[in-house]
């Protein structure tokens, strides 16, 4: 019996997962590649299937797997993705929030379904091209999620959902590397995607028009409504409250003599409140659906650094436990446009303490 540890490489067709696969093969793991088929293009008003990326991406992943001489499969998770990622994406927008579907995909697809798939094939680990690090705390035995060594590429914010079991069975071989080094390896090995651009968009909304996607997907039409000022006075008409997010300035179509920003939405009455930028700042948020990583649970107030959006620098804050598994985060300084549906992630240095969804 072969006791060599086995690794399932989640291959997107991009250079990062390609080099991750190469590094795991070089390290002596029994490797298998897999690309997720997540939805049908009919969901986008197109024909055919779509994977987590594009048909070309699947071809690239398959070509790399062939070059590395590792087995490769495309796995079909369209039903699960429709329910757990697309469904939540639409529900969050319709409830007035702004979702982060990449986090939900990590939670329910890449590190849940793929780990099940790996175990079903006698493999020990799921491997991705994410920029983050995993270590075990020698004192507590807990598995820790840490920032990437090169923080300009760090993706720990979207990985806070990983459980202890998932962290124990996940490898991030790129966590201590920078992008130029990764491309250099890909070029040296002659991989077809060595110079391929990084993907930026939500995979199932490639044109960025998420409202158009929602209307095609649901068959709904999101009607026009009123813009209100902070005193409740009608100041204009909008094109559907789902189109706007907290802090937005561009695309409002309002000429009120001074810049205004989206400050709030009432989805029941289909109104969008706008006001001066000063209305966007607050020190406090409440979050739920929390996943703790470096600690088992929060039992007393804790000093942390917190970020409430992906591109934000962490800010000093205190986190307080509330009833029903909720937490309150109080920032030392007011923060701009804290947005329902987004994630708040807590850090202690380069270690992720935990994270949850802003309510």
Task: Go through each PLM region and give its residues.
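ATP-dependent adenylation/nucleotidyltransferase module used to activate substrates
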Residues: 1-160, 171, 180, 187
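AMP-forming adenylation/ATP pyrophosphatase catalytic core
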Residues: 127-134, 138-139, 143-359
